[in-house]
Amino acid sequence: MQDIYRGFTTAKFMTPKRAIETYKAVRSDYTSVVQEFSAKWTPSGDARFTAIKIQNYRHKINFAIVPADVANSWLLSLYNERLSPDQMPITRYIVQKILLPSILQDIEMKMIGKGKYKAKENPTDVGKPEESMNGIETLLVEAAKSGDKGINFYPNAKDLRTATDAEVVEYIDDFAHKILAKYQSLKMNIFLSADLYVKYKRGYKDKWGAGSGTENPDFGKDRVDFTNFSLQVLDCLYGSPIIFCTPKSNFIMLQNLNQPQVITDIQKVDYEVRYYGEFWLGVGFAFGEMLFASVPTGYDPQAAISDDGSTDFWKKTNTAGEVENPTEGA
């Protein structure tokens, strides 16, 4: 179950750090320190970066199964009445094949991107994963409003969801070339949603046709022309107009300093097997000055949350054959 920290797709683009409840990086950059020699003490060099406090969040898992319920399913071969419910192969199977994937989906689709922390009013209420922590998009939206995190925000940011393919190509190209000169030599990702990625690729193809007119094999691929920056889709950004770019070392996934086992207890209550688990997880950015982002005014990450990243385009039916979320005019 420790795979929860590397099993969700965005994890590989982040740098893991450990802390108890909060993490704050040490300032690591200063203004110019070299000067002409003189025989007098004339100190120079002030800390330049704004270290951002990253909040760690404690999450829990309460999940119950009744192993006997699988008696009429294809999982019957994993049901062994000679064993106690918590020792049955079916119990372990459900942890690895059902519980863990569900945790990873919650993390990717509801928590690390669009999550917005909301404290429970009543501890007995069933919590929602999207209210258990602040995600990347929420952090950027709130920082754009407060203006106190030192982040480089693209001025007059455009909502690229309504832009044409050609406009997306032009916008991202300008975004990439406006990143400060000291970062232009670094190989970094420009993170965006799958929808914006497709718009960029279609617009690029329409502009250049079959080729870009150059022998450089990077042209026409995911690298933005004449830069060291490559487009990278994050699943957690589904339906989002936000794009951002930062070194991997600045993109933080926070764990607990003394991380416990995720599944902390398994209890038998009559025929039911109950799983108790907990883990810590937070996300954020170490330094605002190392982050470049385009965040359009009025965007609400929570409004786009869904279990699977879907929109209202598809008609969905439930087990009773009833249509859910029908498309308007369909």
Per-segment meaning from a language model:
Residues 51-55, 84-87, 91, 275:
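Non-transmembrane, amphipathic alpha-helical segments
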